[in-house]
């Protein structure tokens, strides 16, 4: 029997925030407030939870906002409990690339893929999810590049590939190891590069030795001939690009997945030359920048190690503070700490975890159990509906001055094109006003002043 009830498929309409909102108790509705009242309330609530505080920063906001947000957490609140979706989606890429190259970003520019000879899209549907990048891919194909797609699904990206390797979910490492073993046994290792620029080759050879093509076929579901073809094509190419996204990183063993791909690049010397490299494709406009700015619990700006005494001393001198020699809590750990009561207040900027977390019901329950929640956003999101104080911010892509950093680590200027509605204010100004109420008088004339402070502290942005 066919149902006659029509399902409403229209998207949820969000209300643009134009004025600060506060509530006098959790049982009462929001009421409009002045900025003075809202900031005073936010400062009192956060100040009372200095030892049990977490900051959610935003990968869609500017570099400058993310820098000031992590500084607020570390200097004003005395904690490294700061995180954002830039870590939750691509932390494995940062971990793997940092271990191999000392920096948690891709090694190539977008333009280089137009002039490469071979493209491997692994766990990435770039045609759908990264349309700007895929325009460069199409130019590369037009210029003669061959493309292979490794993905459990035959995606719209795979439709452009010369060959689609539809591996079973979770078998990326067996596939990569089989490719590596075939390259070794076929005598296709770039021995000069391996000797000059790598360590651990003998250990790697022993690691991949069990992964014969026939075993890999049984485990991955991909024909041995197809695996062999990709191995030879990648190793023999004069220049090859290896690209991945969340199909590689969002696994419990995501970092190992990334390292398995990096090893293929090192094995063949497909890195460090124009047109040859690795590209982790980021999901939002400033995912790369959020990590670069230190809006993560285990790194300071420039991916500098919190556990390094010399690094801490540099930041302590610049910020006139003392930094704890330990990592903060990740977003997941912060939600767990809400459950056990060790995290009592959260300052959430531009994120909507009440809707984006895998278990949204659990997220709502835990956020509702906080002593104090401040949300700074442009819309009254589901998370904002749970807040004690809501602060209206400017949109990061049309109403703000600053910069963002894309997947190829290109820093791009953002200029204000529209006047913010109502009383909406710049994120940085809001953060600085809150910091002042909590005893830290930061004077940034504009976003450029923030950028210049960052440049003085981060080796990756000194140019």
Model-predicted segments: where are they?
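Residues at alpha-helix caps and immediate loop-helix transition turns in enzyme cores, especially N-
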Residues: 65-69, 132-133, 256-257, 358-360, ...
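N-terminal export/assembly segments and adjacent metallocofactor-ligating motifs
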Residues: 1-186, 196, 223, 265, ...
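Domain-level signature for respiratory redox metalloenzymes
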Residues: 50, 57, 165, 169-375, ...
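Short, polar loop motifs at secondary-structure junctions
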Residues: 151-156, 376-382
């Amino acid at each position: 029997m066919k149902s006659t009830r029509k399902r409403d498929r229209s998207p949820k309409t969000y209300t643009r925030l134009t004025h600060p909102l506060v509530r006098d108790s959790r049982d009462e509705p929001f009421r409009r407030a002045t900025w003075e009242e809202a900031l005073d309330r936010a400062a009192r609530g956060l100040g009372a939870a200095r030892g049990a505080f977490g900051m959610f920063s935003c990968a869609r906001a500017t570099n400058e906002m993310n820098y000031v947000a992590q500084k607020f957490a570390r200097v004003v609140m005395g904690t490294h409990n700061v995180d954002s979706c830039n870590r939750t989606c691509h932390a494995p890429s940062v971990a793997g690339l940092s271990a191999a190259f000392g920096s948690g970003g891709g090694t190539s520019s977008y333009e280089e893929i137009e002039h490469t000879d071979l493209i491997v899209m692994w766990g990435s549907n770039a045609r759908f999810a990264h349309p700007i990048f895929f325009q460069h891919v199409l130019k590369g194909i037009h210029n003669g590049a061959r493309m292979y797609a490794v993905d459990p699904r035959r995606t719209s990206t795979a439709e452009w590939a010369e060959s689609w390797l539809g591996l079973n979910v979770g078998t990326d490492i067996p596939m990569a190891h089989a490719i590596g073993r075939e390259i070794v046994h076929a005598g296709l290792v770039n021995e000069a590069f391996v000797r000059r620029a790598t360590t651990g080759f003998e250990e790697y050879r022993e690691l991949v030795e069990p992964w014969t093509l026939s075993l890999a076929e049984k485990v991955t579901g991909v024909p041995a001939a197809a695996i062999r073809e990709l191995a030879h094509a990648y190793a023999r190419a004069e220049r090859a690009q290896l690209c991945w996204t969340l199909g590689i990183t969002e696994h419990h063993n995501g970092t190992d997945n990334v390292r398995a791909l990096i090893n293929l690049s090192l094995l063949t010397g497909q890195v460090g030359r124009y047109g040859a490299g690795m590209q982790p494709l980021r999901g939002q406009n400033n995912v790369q920048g959020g990590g670069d700015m230190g809006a993560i619990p285990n790194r300071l700006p420039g991916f500098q190690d919190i556990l390094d005494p010399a690094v801490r001393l540099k930041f302590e001198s610049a910020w006139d503070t003392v930094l704890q020699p330990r990592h903060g809590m990740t977003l997941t750990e912060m939600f767990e700490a809400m459950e056990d009561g060790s995290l009592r207040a959260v300052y959430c900027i531009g994120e909507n975890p009440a809707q984006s977390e895998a278990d949204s019901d659990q997220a709502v329950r835990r956020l509702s159990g906080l002593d104090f929640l401040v949300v700074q956003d442009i819309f009254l999101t589901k998370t904002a509906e749970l807040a004690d104080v809501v602060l209206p911010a400017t949109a990061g892509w049309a109403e703000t001055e600053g910069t963002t950093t894309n997947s190829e680590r290109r820093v791009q200027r953002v200029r204000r094109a529209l006047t913010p509605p109502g009383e909406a204010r710049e994120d940085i100004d809001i953060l600085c006003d809150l910091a002042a109420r909590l005893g830290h008088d930061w004077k940034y004339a504009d976003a450029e002043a923030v950028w210049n402070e960052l440049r003085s502290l981060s080796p990756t942005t000194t140019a």
